Amino acid sequence: QESYLLLAIYGLSMLASSIPAVLVVFFVRDLLGTEELTGLFLLLYFLSGASAMPLWRAMSVRLGKNQAWVFSNILAVVGFIGAFFLGTGDHWAYAIVCVVSGLALGADLTLPPSILADHIHAHNHTAYSGMHYALLGFVAKFSLALASAIALPTLDAAGFKPHAANSEQALMTLSIAYALIPSALKLTSAGLLYSYILRSQPGVSHGKIQNHSNHRPSHHA
């Protein structure tokens, strides 16, 4: 059951990242008005994610993998909320958003597979490790498909027209879908993960106490 909870948390986190990925072209072109910079923004985002991967590994050693993942979700929320307040011509501010959200992406690429590997090893589920990793890959791909199924009809219902003049309501819907909905999903993911950490601690502590008692020397003959 814990494996499926971790997969659900990962799914929420990936869905939060996938919605902006689906809408980024619309956001940059139709809201920011800087279509010519789309490629540079994407490059900045992915380079930030790749460069952050060693940093997240180091942080996971210092703080713990689950704790580091919680922190990365909060960092992603900071980036997404910042994007909500942007408007036409705010390309420098959006570049900062790309860096911040890219840094958070590095954690999503690094930590979940490692956390799942630790879980498999701790619970002696090595016989099912292939299935678990296959599910991890499936969840990532399904999240992208689900993001398209949610975001695009939502924009269409609000009257948003790509590459055209749009009403304030349509652009506001775009901002909400691009920034606030992912923020809510990331916060939910962080909350579930934090709850998982709290539930895991008593068992870990008990295990350490039990292990210590088993190795305590006996005073009986």
Model-derived features: where do they sit?
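Membrane-embedded alpha-helical bundles of multi-pass transporters/translocases
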Residues: Q1-A221
